[in-house]
Amino acid sequence: MKKLSIIFLSLTISLAAISQTASGILRYYLHRQATYDVVLDRLKRITYLGDSLTQIRYTDNTRHTILNHRIDSIVYIANSSVPNSPSNRAVNRNRNTDPQASQLEFPHRKEGEMNLLIKHSTPEYGNTYSLEWDCSKKSNRWTCYQMYDGNTCDNEKRNNTFREDEDIPTAYRTVLSQYVGSGFSRGHLCPAADRRCSKVQNQQTFYLSNMQPQYQRHNAGVWKRLETQVRAWNNTAFRDTLFVVKAATIDRDDQISGTTRSGLLIPKYFYMAILCKKDGHYQAIGLWTLHDEKKHSGDFSQYAISIDELERRTGIDFFCNLPDDIEDEIESRLNIDAWRIKTPHQSVRHIKNHRSQNN
């Protein structure tokens, strides 16, 4: 039995069954739908203050301080129940050390106190999405999330409840008035159509932290078509889980088109990184689009690049929590056929064949 040192000031929780196994995670559902995952096989101490989680200390003496978020509930998840987590025994030299960013969808975190990790979730459906927010730029670096049978439904309509993200300090967040008269749409990264299991889940996609200023023709054109393609991959015949990153370029001067009069940074490119796991096998693809007001090709293969190439263009390490051997293999190759990407000609032929079969 691994001994867990827990400090309780006024909160009492029984962890007897968990401490006997000392593996898996404790998932804390915190106030305002935030979650925090504690990795038990590295845990040294959990500190509480009243009914709030305050600090996690691990056996390597790293500490993670939580800003006194009130605990709504705690769930224990055994290793076998954590979907698609790589083995702790696998060699992984570039993984995120923050347990909050240990799932496969997370890119490598950018260091520095001005880069915030924000997570939105619901108790019923788990993590809605996570994002990295650059306070110095007041901009989203990336949004990431998973798609699988348990968190993608068709229960709710679009809510359109655009609002500020109060998890970001007031001085560093974007506000609704910045988009008014800017000439840009509030472009979703995690789209509302990907999160329709519940009203709260759908509403969470409308935080401005999940937006980038986007030309409407791009937003309703090529970006929307690529979003639809991702949802087409989200079926049990193709995947067990999709790990999705959606983002726009904010880090390099030559990949920024400028700023609006209200101070919104205008990305020059939008992109996606998709990892698919099916029956224990992985494949990955990058999708890269120029952000402009022109009409873009309907041939999705023109946007497809390898993850290695996407990393070269962005400077971001995607899917860093995979074991190194798997990461190196899947990120270096691009198999268009495996992703079943149709050219416009193939799409028309598919529609005609479908119609003839139903006549």
What do these predicted ranges mean?
Residues 1-24:
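Bacterial Sec-dependent N-terminal signal peptides
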Residues 29-31, 41-359:
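Domain-level detector for secreted/extracellular nuclease and nuclease-toxin modules, and
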Residues 21-38:
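Short N-terminal segments immediately surrounding and downstream of signal-peptide cleavage
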